[in-house]
Amino acid sequence: MGLVGCVGKSSLVSMELRWARRRKSDNAASALPRSIPIYISTLKKDINLEELRNLYSLCNHSCNRLSEKDSNVEKIVDMKKLRRAISRSDVIVSVFCKPQHVDVDDAVLYSEEESLSSSLYTSEFGRQNKDDSFLGDLFQNAVPLTPSNGQLVGFGRAYSDYGLTASIHDLMVLPSLQRMGIGKLIVNRIVRLLTSRDIYDIAALCFEDERPFFKACGFGDDRMGSTTMMFTKSLEA
């Protein structure tokens, strides 16, 4: 796990509809469309906590930085802590796509873990599966993509002191939609929001195998060669 820094600047958009495209060499996802529309939001009101918690699980992303990197995430942070973390995060970026554009395995896992009682996205149209009728798919494709009818497939957040420094945490993209540039879009949006507030000392808390990705996003080692250290000593009564 390390700490890397970045500098950047650009304009602000709180909501945006973009297209994500798969690489031609990515044969693993050949059954899925090569280009899909995605909805990018920086509004906290668009986040459904139950869907976000499911995304943590689907991405095998743990909030516990002391856990093993490759171990399965059996217990996600509880809902109260997650709600508090989101409410106190300074920057939130979420990405949505239409449910039929998600890999069927991810869709099945998502459906099994989704709590319908707390979901904001239940509607009379339901979520589309590959065996749905042609008319149902046609209608779903015609409906404009929004957070209310889309599935949360990407997420990232940042904390700052509102003056000097900020750090990026919990960057996630649904496995079947990785390698489409969605993660880079999330990082770039976070950086633009922070630099618009005149905050340029931006760090990313990441694992060693994530460093090449952040390097491609413009991050690098700081001048002091510093690294992150976690408190590991048990507190004595």
From Swiss-Prot:
EC assignment: 2.3.1.48
Return any one Pfam family short name.
Answer: Acetyltransf_1
Q: Which cysteine pairs make disulfide bonds?
A: none
Q: Which residues bind acetyl-CoA?
A: 171-173, 179-184, 207-209, 214
Q: Which UniProt keywords apply?
A: Acyltransferase, Chloroplast, Plastid, Transferase, Transit peptide
Primary location group: plastid
Q: How is this chain modified after translation?
A: Autoacetylated.
**Family annotation (InterPro entries):** Acyl_CoA_acyltransferase, GNAT_dom, GNPNAT1-like
Compartments in which it is found = Plastid, Chloroplast
**Domain N-acetyltransferase: start-end pairs:** 94-237
The reaction(s) annotated as catalysed by this protein in its Swiss-Prot or TrEMBL entry are: an N-terminal L-alpha-aminoacyl-[protein] + acetyl-CoA = N-terminal N(alpha)-acetyl-L-alpha-aminoacyl-[protein] + CoA + H(+); L-lysyl-[protein] + acetyl-CoA = N(6)-acetyl-L-lysyl-[protein] + CoA + H(+)
Q: Does the keyword Phosphoprotein apply?
A: no
Q: Please list the tissues where expression of this protein has been recorded.
A: Expressed in green tissues.
According to its UniProt entry, the function of this protein is described as: Protein acetyltransferase with dual specificity triggering both N-alpha-acetylation (NTA) and epsilon-lysine acetylation (KA), possibly with a low efficiency or toward specific plastid substrates.
Protein name as catalogued:
GCN5-related N-acetyltransferase 3, chloroplastic
Originating species: Arabidopsis thaliana (Mouse-ear cress)
